[in-house]
């Protein structure tokens, strides 16, 4: 079979205007970037304000493994197959970060015959949204540092006289807004700024990856440009010496930050290999952010299509949970059904019976099975790993929506093991189970899956949130740990307890929680496979994201700036003699 890159480069593409018109967009509602990409103007929402909305399908997965489960492959394949059976369908997915592209994970355009094309354009830069987020974010960091410098240099009276601005009295050790870059770079996790004469005061700072920026979450959760402007104004950049918040609005930088992102709020339209439309917008990670594409992209697609297929990052304990408790809480758009992706390899890797260590995963040691073992039939490991799939089935079902299991078939899979797995799933709480060959067959490979999803979406949704707004922060943490992960409880550090009290006193206790934890286990510990029990979730820090509208709980050793592994992806990427990019995948 051809590589993903070869398949993409040989694809026969339609002009993106044709894709948009077929979806229901007007030519003037598309801002063209060549023939393959277009920004969608938000004026389409006004034109279609009274339009009946389609059905939203959320794709999630079992606990991820280094072998890849094929969640985006399934999302794109399902969209292609829904269109093939006569349903009007559109995919809505996130923009890939270059950190994982050059790191371990690689691109995020799907794969095989179920991918967004041209895949190299999607995986590198796209229409520049992530760069806009980085620039706007770093403007905020530069602004707070400059304000601190001038206030310290002049003092209150002289500063107000010369600048005409209010003295903010910034506490240097309480600056909360640091800098971002769209790369994995561990040496930037802890830095000092303001060093040298006329550059200070000095204070400790850091870099996060851009996908972890609150601006990325705001981009994903805003309803329109005006809403984004209000949210950016609420950003808490620092505290003053009295412990009061200093916002981007207080600093006077919110308008300029919004201006930088004025085009970034428009989703980008691309196409799949069979010409199905795909809206790509925002890129928050699911382990250190809320892990879902934008409300705006969903809203546009739902007014134009019968079915909209979106996905949450990593397993159902991560992106799906945040889709429900953060995104749906703010959008009001509940899903009609969920698709839960699994593979035989994933279940064996999640069996807890593997012993080999993956040395290429940065910061953590993750048990894995080598390729030779994982491709061989092994009923004992499969049955042990099924417990993980069954947990995820029940986890999705507790939100009141029907769940369809999609088994992403690999060429090496055993027919007997596939049959056993289908029978096991059909005896579970899942609505149905289908084998997907979308990777190898494109639209023809997920017809049965599409038909089952349509039937599942006909059931009246009983969607429910995991916890109410009015619950205390401690109660929300306990619910997420005990119900969301099956933990015995939650443990807050002294700092986290103080932060919970402070955030509640400041009026932020009603916000939902965004748990930043490892995606490689249902628990906080990546070495605990299958369905861990009797563990306590350690919360070390609570971070306010007032603009996005949630509070992040940092769990265990999770980092907001990844590092490159021993064998980074950039080693395979180059330009060939024809000037074409090679090695992406």
From Swiss-Prot:
Gene3D superfamilies (UniProt xref): Domain 2, N(10)-formyltetrahydrofolate synthetase, Formyltetrahydrofolate synthetase, domain 3, P-loop containing nucleotide triphosphate hydrolases
Q: Which PROSITE patterns match?
A: FTHFS_1
Instruction: Cite the InterPro entries for this sequence.
Output: Formate_THF_ligase, Formate_THF_ligase_CS, P-loop_NTPase
Keyword Ligase belongs to the record: yes
Q: What is its EC number?
A: 6.3.4.3
Q: In which pathway is this protein known to take part?
A: One-carbon metabolism; tetrahydrofolate interconversion
Family (UniProt): Belongs to the formate--tetrahydrofolate ligase family.
The protein, known as: Formate--tetrahydrofolate ligase
Gene name in the database record: fhs
């Amino acid at each position: 079979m051809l590589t993903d890159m070869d398949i993409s480069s040989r694809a026969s593409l339609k002009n993106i205007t044709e894709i948009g018109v077929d979806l229901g967009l007007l030519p003037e509602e598309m801002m063209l970037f060549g023939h393959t990409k277009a920004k969608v103007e938000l004026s389409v929402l006004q034109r279609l304000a009274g339009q009946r909305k389609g059905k939203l399908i959320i794709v999630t997965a079992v606990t991820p493994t280094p072998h890849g489960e094929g969640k985006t492959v399934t999302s794109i394949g399902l969209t292609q197959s829904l269109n093939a059976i006569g349903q009007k369908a559109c995919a809505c997915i996130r923009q890939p970060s270059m950190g994982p592209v050059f790191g371990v994970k690689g691109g995020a355009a799907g794969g095989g015959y179920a991918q967004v094309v041209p895949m190299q354009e999607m995986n590198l830069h796209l229409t520049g949204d992530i760069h806009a987020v980085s620039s706007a974010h770093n403007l905020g960091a530069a602004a707070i540092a400059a304000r601190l410098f001038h206030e310290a240099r002049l003092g209150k009276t002289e500063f107000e006289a010369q600048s005409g601005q209010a003295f903010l009295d910034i506490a240097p050790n309480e600056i909360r807004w640091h800098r971002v870059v769209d790369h994995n770079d561990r040496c930037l996790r802890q830095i000092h700024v303001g060093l040298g004469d006329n550059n200070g005061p000095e204070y400790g700072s850091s870099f996060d990856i851009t996908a972890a920026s609150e601006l990325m979450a705001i981009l994903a959760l805003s309803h329109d440009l005006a809403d984004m402007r209000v949210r950016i104004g609420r950003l808490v950049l620092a505290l003053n010496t009295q412990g009061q918040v200093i916002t981007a609005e207080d600093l006077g930088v919110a308008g300029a930050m919004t201006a930088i992102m004025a085009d970034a709020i428009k989703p980008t339209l691309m196409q799949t290999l069979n010409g199905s439309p795909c809206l790509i917008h925002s890129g928050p990670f699911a382990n250190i952010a809320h892990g879902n594409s934008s409300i705006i992209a969903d809203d546009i697609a739902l007014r134009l299509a019968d079915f909209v297929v979106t996905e949450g990052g990593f397993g159902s304990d991560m992106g799906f949970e945040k889709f429900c408790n953060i995104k749906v809480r703010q959008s009001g758009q509940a899903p009609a059904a969920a698709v839960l992706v699994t593979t035989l390899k994933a279940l064996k890797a999640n069996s807890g019976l593997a012993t080999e260590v993956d040395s290429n995963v940065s910061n953590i040691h993750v048990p894995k099975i080598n390729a030779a073992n994982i491709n061989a039939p092994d009923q004992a490991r499969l049955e042990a790993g099924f417990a993980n799939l069954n947990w995820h089935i029940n986890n999705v079902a507790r939100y009141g929506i029907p769940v369809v299991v999609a088994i992403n078939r690999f060429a090496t899979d055993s027919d007997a093991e596939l049959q056993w797995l289908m029978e096991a799933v059909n005896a579970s709480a899942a609505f149905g189970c289908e084998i997907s060959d979308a990777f190898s067959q494109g639209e023809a490979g997920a017809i049965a899956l599409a038909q089952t999803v349509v039937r599942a979406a006909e059931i009246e949704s009983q969607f429910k949130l995991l916890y109410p707004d009015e619950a205390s922060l401690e109660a929300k943490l306990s619910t997420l740990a005990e119900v969301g992960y099956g933990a015995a409880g939650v443990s807050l550090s002294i700092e986290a307890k103080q932060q919970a009290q402070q955030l509640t006193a400041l009026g932020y206790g009603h916000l939902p929680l965004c748990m930043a934890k490892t995606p490689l286990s249902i628990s906080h510990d990546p070495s605990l496979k299958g369905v861990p029990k009797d563990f306590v979730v350690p919360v070390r820090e609570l971070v306010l994201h007032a603009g996005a509208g949630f509070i992040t709980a940092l769990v265990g050793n999770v980092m907001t700036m990844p590092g490159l592994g021993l064998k980074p992806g950039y080693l395979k990427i180059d330009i060939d003699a024809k000037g074409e990019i090679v090695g992406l995948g």
